[in-house]
Amino acid sequence: MSIKKKFSSLPADQDAAIAEVEAILRHKRWQMPFKRGLDIVASAFGLLILTPVFLGVALAIKLDDGGPVFYRQLRVGRNGKPFSILKFRTMVQNADRAGLPLTVGADPRVTKVGQLLRRTKLDELAQLMNVLRGEMSLVGPRPEVLRYVDMYDPLQRMALRLRPGVTDPASIRYRDETRCWVPPPIRSGLISIR
């Protein structure tokens, strides 16, 4: 089912929509411990079998510019709790201080290795560590930076009731946001609830 169809079924009245989402969450409450168990097993297994890939990516980043392997950024997690998301670094050091908050087009801050990591989404693999620590889930609403969460309306805030995910339906649909910028997929978190 398309994202548009999913949202077309939401009531126009935000209070009714919030009540519907709360009912869905209550109904799925028993599933959450099983989902967490699956996250632990899958992320631990993924980290184990992907160790050679992690080492290769780390070596490539070090050989490219000698900087740190990981990039950490503060994101908003479940129940609004901030956490430090991990990614393999794809930009020059201190890039967040030297440009736009979004990467667009041929951003000169992206390293050569970083271009490959972004194109293949290998930079996201480090988030398996966030999943294992319980800060994220494999599937859920994408974790946003605080400045976007501050703009959420009450319905959008419902997504914060879930553990953020490494992937979600919007991440698949808007896979390459650097070519075609769309507003942050704020409402995508609600799709994860459904």
For each feature predicted by the language model, list its residue ranges:
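Glycine-centered flexibility sites
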Residues: 46, 66-67, 77-80, 99, ...
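Short, hydrophobic secondary-structure boundary micro-motifs
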Residues: 57, 100, 139-141, 146-147, ...
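N-terminal hydrophobic signal-anchor/signal peptide
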Residues: 1-48, 154-158, 178, 182-194
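A short, structured surface patch at a secondary-structure boundary
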Residues: 104-169
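Short, glycine-rich, amphipathic interfacial segments at transmembrane boundaries or analogous
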Residues: 4-15, 71-109, 170-194
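A hydrophobic, helix-centered structural microdomain
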Residues: 3-7, 22-95, 130
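Acidic side chains
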Residues: 39, 64-65, 96, 107, ...
